[in-house]
Each structure stands twice: as structure tokens, then as C-alpha cells.
Amino acid sequence: MASYDLVVIGTGPGGYVCAVRAAQLGMKVAVIEKNPTLGGTCLNVGCMPSKALLHASEMFEEAAHSFAKMGVSVSAPKLDLPSMMNFKQQGIDGNVKGVEFLMKKNKIDVINGKGKILGAGKVEVTGSDGKAQTVETKNIVIATGSDIARLKGIEIDEKRVVSSTGALSLAKVPEKLLIIGAGVIGLELGSVWKRLGAEVMVVEFLDRILPGMDGEVAKQFQRMLEKQGFAFKLGAKVTAVDTSGKMLKARVEPAAGGPVETLETDVVLVCIGRVPYTEGLGCKEAGIALDNRGRVQIDAHFSTTVKGVYAIGDVVAGPMLAHKAEDEGVACAEIIAGQAGHVNYDVIPGVVYTTPEVSSVGKTEEELKQAGVAYTSGKFPFTANGRSKVNQTTDGFVKILADAKTDRVLGVHIVGREAGEMIHEACVLMEFGGSAEDLARTCHAHPTRSEAIKEAALAVGKRAIHM
């Protein structure tokens, strides 16, 4: 019977990063993976493939609509969808091989099969052939991630009624695409297929898009998407999808009640969020407590209700983000090794990888108002940023929220080109408790889009230069 210092169940960003850090700290480590490839949802059917398609579809749209005004004449671009999907797969394969390399480099054993916790220190692994083996370990980390959330009464077949997984591998561009849910995943995948020629309708139960993001940012971003051709039905819900005919028929009704309408579409994408994945893990039998949303309950040190069993990532409370899982993986490994691992949950950025991008870190205006925190706001539009103007990519703005008394930055929100790359100077600033004044007095290279962040910091003190 194999014996380890640590066994990690799941090899997504949280799991494999936890395993690597534990190995760096001198532990004998094994990972258990039920899928044929390492990397979890993120690398195989999530973050990475969606970014490949977002990039490829953006290039397709740029060639069709933006090259001419820059003096670049090309014939009308022709879509080769199989080749685009191959481009996506090459990216997936490269990243998966990268994780495999990390396992070998750090002498981490990879055990293929489905893991089940038998109790403290014991994990049963059942392979695809049905044969089971038991692995002994001093510590266990649950990093099993999340699964797609499903709508009652709407069956996902991954062909015409699809989840995010199916939407990454459609055989052809649908003429009409109906998306249920106006969150990050739905808007990103909607952007891919809109650029490639689909007519996109988004139905959202709430009265706004991007729940949880700053309200002003969400409102402005919705207008930008509508200019791109997106259509929205907010405050509405899809209660049924008739798949019997050539066209799908979605039953849509107001969330507050009212007249029902039927929308015809080629493909329905169900994007209403994700749920923690604990199926077959043996939590109940092992005495590992779950909360009322199915998440593994942990304390401040990632410990579950069973000694020596820890949990991180999407399977526990908090935002379901790969980078949050990675940070938890590092912290958890360090805590197991007797060190002071830590995650600052107030400084976890979020990004929507559309065009333009949306990024944020820290508190929204709504959250500060609800908490009764006095704050000042500084805003700077990209229309007043030299680099954005000369590149003719002026959509969006930067908004900085700072404590009214101390000037400490509490939140930063960006909508605009490359917002996902720009947010990180705000993360560093906030990690060190920096103020808007600190940011305003930091020299920024010219001409860059990042100068808009400095100007927004200046605007907190009502002294922006270029506005």
C-alpha cells in the first residue's frame, strides 16, 4: 500500500499548485485525477479554451471590421471553424503537458482514478477498469472543483442545449444563440459566437448583468455589448425548452410574473453558475461536513471537520476563480508544513475577458454604501487617455474608490481594453494598504493605458490632469 505525506484529490489550478508547493516543502506527494488529462475544468473545458476562442474570434472580427481604417487592406476573412477549434486544442494540450512536466519535476505521483475518502489518512482510488486501490497518507486535500449548475426541467445534451463545455466545441456557428444567465461565462462565450456570426440573446433573472460587479461598470458595459449587437432580456427567466422541432423553442416569462413569450433559437447555452463537486467523494461517510449549498466546510486554516483533511478552491466558500484556488493551494500546503500560509480575500481580482475587458478588485460602491463606509471616488475615461485615443480604443473608464478619511484604496474597477492586465497594479497597491495618493504619485510610462489608473487616482483628490 502506497503511503504519502499528502494526497491531493483533483488536479485543477488549486490541486496541482497545492501539490507542487507541498513537494517544494519536502513532502512526498500524490495527486488523484479521475479525468484522462490533468488540469481540471480550467485547463480542459474552462478558462484556457475559452481564452483561445476569445482571442481567435477577436482576430477574426478585427480583420473584418478594423483593419481597413488602419490602412490594411485584406479580402473578407473566411471562417475555418475546425481550424479554430484545433488552435484551441493545441493550447489545451500545451498547458496540460506543462502540468504533467511539473508533476515529474517535483516527483509527484499521479494516480488515475476516482478518489473516495475512507476516513482520516485513507483514500480509495477506483480506476476506469473498476479496480480499486487504497492509498495511505498523513494529509488529504480536497480540490475537486465545481460542476455546471443545471436548470430544473431543461436537459443539457451538449449539442443543442449546451453548458459552457458544449459551447466551447460547437460544430458550426449557430444563426441564433440564446444564453441563460448574464454572468461572466455567458458573456464571454456569447462574445465568441457573436463575433463569428451568431445572433445573441441573453436572458437574465436579475435586472442587471454581471451580478456582484460594480453597478455603474455593469450598466456601461451592457451598453457596449448592445452596440456590438447583443440583445438582453433582464428580469426574465427561461422555464422550458422545446427540442422537438428543427428550431428550439424557449419559454420565457418575467421573473416577477406576467405574459409568457416563446423565443426560437438554434442553440441554448445554460450559464447560471457552478456548484461544488463532491459526488462520490465519501464526505458524509467520512464525517466531512458540507454547508447548505453543498460546499465543504472549512476553518481559517482550510481544515474540514475531519482532522488531517483539508479543502480548497471551488469546493469551498468564496468566489469560484482559478487564481483564488491557486492561492489557497499554496497557503494550505504551507499550513500543513507548519508555516503561516495566508490568503487575502479582500484583494482577489475578477476579470471578464470580452472586448472591452472588465476587471475589478476590492469593494464596489454598492458594498461600501451597504456597509456605511464613507468613501471618495475618482474616475477617468479612456477617451482622455492618449494611447487609447491614438489606437481608437476609447471605450470605458477607470474608477477608484478610497476611504474618505484615510485615502486607503478600497476598490478599483476598470472597463476597457486590456483591463485584465491593468488591474494588477491596483492589487499590489491594496495588498500593501496603499492610498490613492501613493498611486497618484507613482510615475507611469507614457503613452500607456495604465496612465488612466494614475489619472483616476488623481481624480480621487479632484486633480486629474487630462480631464
For every predicted segment, state its role.
Residues 1-12, 173-183:
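Beta1/beta-strand and adjacent pyrophosphate-binding region of the FAD-binding site
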Residues 2-4, 21-173, 201, 206-210, ...:
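Glycine-rich flavin
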Residues 7-9, 115, 134-145, 179-180, ...:
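Short hydrophobic core segments
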Residues 9-35, 41, 48, 53-59, ...:
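Flexible, glycine-rich terminal cap/loop adjacent to redox cofactors
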Residues 10-15, 145, 181-186, 273, ...:
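Conserved phosphate-binding and hydrolysis motifs of nucleotide-dependent enzymes
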Residues 14-18, 161, 186-189, 195, ...:
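Short glycine/serine/threonine-rich phosphate/pyrophosphate-binding segments
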Residues 47, 144-199, 203, 228-231, ...:
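Glycine-rich dinucleotide-binding loop and its adjacent helix/turn
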Residues 157-174, 262-336, 421:
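FAD-site-proximal beta/loop scaffold in flavoenzymes
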